[in-house]
């Protein structure tokens, strides 16, 4: 009965004009809590809509507008949006009755087939790609249900000089709306504005850094600067224009990484997205450092090439990489060791990736054009220079990892798979470098 009265009050509160003025992109900056931290509504809406549909929009609506309108369905608002649920696995498409050429199913149709997904999930014992896709589709449907039941969107309320977050369903109650109707013709807008003001007084607007981080899209600008830098360094004898755009690229990426660190409060190396991000920028910085000593622009070009590959992965490999900022798993909740051991290891990946780029460029050049023996030996020397940096960083990272293990678990080395294989990799690279410095590997 209470929900019915609330729905009626909401319908009265939302004239056609007011409804249009509420669910707008002005809500992008609204504070909400999800995944254990405070973030702008824009981030929650974009991540959730993209997770459900694979797109950042629903029809012509932005993620924030669609998220808002879907959330108001819980209160009887007459809103119908063509939400499509992403389905990628061909066998999951079959059980849901989707053509192989299609990549999504209408959410209302998918909800009627939830029992089919549950049955298939129970039948499938092996944790293969089929089972993972069923689980993911179920999670998408559960996320949609949480939105339309007004459970996912949380709203701040002041409580004893602090802020708590409650679900939208708990926030828009009959009592609150009835009280505020005496103060404003648009009680819902008034309630939300009042809650935001109270939040800003207590917590401030530091959470808006995340909104600026995503809106500025610095990695896209860095991608463009990287392409221009490569073109200038390859095509022009005067290397200064390329050097300037290389510096711009580094500046953009370091700014973006710094913002991400400030938002998360930890080192930017906790998942695959951040590994790709940090290794790409790290490779370019290491390439510039090596160039200062060797005076060879090929290192910078190699760093830019690996960097553009990393940026392309970050932009387009959405199925593999998640750009979201998530809380740390318990084993990584030590910011000092995370910022030393893990960053050192990833910088070693970056240096070794430079050797990979230089070596492949040398082989391709040798395959399609004549490379003199002197040029070939010089190219090989560039490869080994990158490897030396990588091996030093890898060794340092492994030692730091052992110290962290001793600090956390009371033992320096336990021969678990990660420790064993990291040592194998280090020994292989050390054998190659040793062979090059002796007579094992000919010049």
What are these language model-derived features?
Residues 9-18:
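Hydrophobic h-region of N-terminal signal peptides that target proteins for export
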Residues 195-214, 255-276, 319-343, 372-375, ...:
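Membrane-interface interhelical loops and short amphipathic "cap" helices
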């Amino acid at each position: 009965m209470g929900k019915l009265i609330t729905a009626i009050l909401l319908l009265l509160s939302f004239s056609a004009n007011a409804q249009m003025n509420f669910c707008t992109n002005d809500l992008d900056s609204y504070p909400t809590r999800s995944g254990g931290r405070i973030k702008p509504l824009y981030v929650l809406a974009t991540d959730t809509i993209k997770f459900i549909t694979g797109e950042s929009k629903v029809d012509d609506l932005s993620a924030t507008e669609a998220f808002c309108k879907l959330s108001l369905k819980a209160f009887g608002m007459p809103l119908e949006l063509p939400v499509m649920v992403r389905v990628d696995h061909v066998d999951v498409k079959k059980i849901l009755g989707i053509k192989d050429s299609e990549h999504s199913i209408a959410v209302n149709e998918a909800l009627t087939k939830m029992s089919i997904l549950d049955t298939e999930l129970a039948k499938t014992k092996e944790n293969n790609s089929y089972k993972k896709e069923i689980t993911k589709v179920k999670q998408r449907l559960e996320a949609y249900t949480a939105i339309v039941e007004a459970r996912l969107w949380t709203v701040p309320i002041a409580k004893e000089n602090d802020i708590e977050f409650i679900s939208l369903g708990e926030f828009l109650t009959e009592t609150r709306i009835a009280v505020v109707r005496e103060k404003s013709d648009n009680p819902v807008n008034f309630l939300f504005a009042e809650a935001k003001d109270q939040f800003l007084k207590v917590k401030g607007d530091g959470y808006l850094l995340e909104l600026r981080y995503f809106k500025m899209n610095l990695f896209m600008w860095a991608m463009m600067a990287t392409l221009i830098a490569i073109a200038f360094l390859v095509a022009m004898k005067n290397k200064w224009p390329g050097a300037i755009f290389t510096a711009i690229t580094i500046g953009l990426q370091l700014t973006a990484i710094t913002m991400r660190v400030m938002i998360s409060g930890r080192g930017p190396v906790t998942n695959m997205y951040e590994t790709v991000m940090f290794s790409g920028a790290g490779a370019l910085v290491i390439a510039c450092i090596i160039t200062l000593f060797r005076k060879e622009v090929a290192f910078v070009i190699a760093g830019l090439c690996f960097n553009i590959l990393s940026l392309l992965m970050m932009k387009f490999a959405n199925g593999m990489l998640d750009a979201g900022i998530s809380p740390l798993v318990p084993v990584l909740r030590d910011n000092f060791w995370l910022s030393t051991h893990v960053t050192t290891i990833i910088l070693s990946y970056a240096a070794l990736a430079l050797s990979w780029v230089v070596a492949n460029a040398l082989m391709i050049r040798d395959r399609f054009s004549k490379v003199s023996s002197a040029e070939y030996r010089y190219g090989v020397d560039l490869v080994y220079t990158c490897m030396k940096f990588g091996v030093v960083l890898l060794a340092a990272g492994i030692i730091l990892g052992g110290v962290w293990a001793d600090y956390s678990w009371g033992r320096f080395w336990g021969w678990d798979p990660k420790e064993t294989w990291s040592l194998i990799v280090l020994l292989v690279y050390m054998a190659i470098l040793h062979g090059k410095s002796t007579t094992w590997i000919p010049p």
